[in-house]
UniProtKB/Swiss-Prot annotation:
Periplasmic side: 30-193
Signal peptide positions (record): none
Protein's name in the database: Ancillary SecYEG translocon subunit
Oligomer and partners: Interacts with the SecYEG translocon. Forms a complex with PpiD.
Pfam families given in the database record: TPR_21
Function: May mediate protein transfer from the SecYEG translocon to the periplasmic chaperone network via its periplasmic C-terminal region.
SUPFAM superfamilies, per database record: TPR-like
Membrane topology: Single-pass type II membrane protein
Length: 193
């Protein structure tokens, strides 16, 4: 009797291990397939954004609404860029603001906020742009924020604050191309005086 129960115990242990492995593999592969499917949908949607037909944009907007993942946020950024290129700033702002509501990743939020502020500067909504820039607390974005603040101050004709912000940005900036742009702006202001 003891011999039969040992065989039964071994059988049940092996049965349990096999079932566990099957369930684990099934769960793992279903997650991988789901992520691959989202990735493929994202690639397909981005191709539609890059086409010039505007009827594709409705499908893109639906994709963004249905996907509150990183794919939805990245798609919203691409769609907003397309709207800005078509000078449809209100629709671009709408896409970015909607994505900002559900995005959890801090750097993506900051990227959305910077793009929102850029559009608001284009629309001469300088106070709104300044307010949204003030909400970005991460010091890694400080050079971009100060550069944009300088642009805002120029728009409201506050040259002293513009110079101050651009100099802060110049001090923090690592990119030589950005430094050249800031220096050009500073030199242009000096020539005007």
């Amino acid at each position: 009797m003891l011999n039969i129960s040992k065989k039964n115990i071994i059988f049940f242990i092996l049965f349990f291990l096999i079932i566990s492995l099957i369930l684990f593999n099934w769960k793992y592969f279903s997650l991988v397939n789901k992520e691959n499917l989202e990735s493929l949908k994202y690639e397909k949607i981005i191709k539609k954004i890059n086409k010039k037909k505007s009827k594709n944009l409705y499908e893109v907007e639906n994709f963004i609404v249905q996907n509150t993942s990183i794919y939805g946020t990245l798609t919203a950024l691409s769609l907003a860029k397309k709207y800005v290129e078509c000078n449809n700033l209100d629709k671009a702002l709408l896409q970015l603001n909607n994505s900002l509501k559900y995005t959890k990743e801090e750097n993506l939020k900051n990227l959305l906020k910077i793009n929102i502020a850029k559009i608001q500067i284009q629309k001469n909504e300088n106070n709104k742009a300044m307010n949204i820039l003030e909400t970005i607390q991460n010091h890694n974005w400080k050079n971009i924020i100060e550069h944009m603040k300088g642009d805002i101050f120029i728009n409201i004709n506050n040259k002293k604050e513009a110079i101050k912000s651009w100099k802060k940005s110049l001090f923090i900036e690592d990119s030589n191309a950005s430094k050249e742009i800031i220096n050009m702006k500073l030199n242009e202001l000096k020539e005007q005086n």
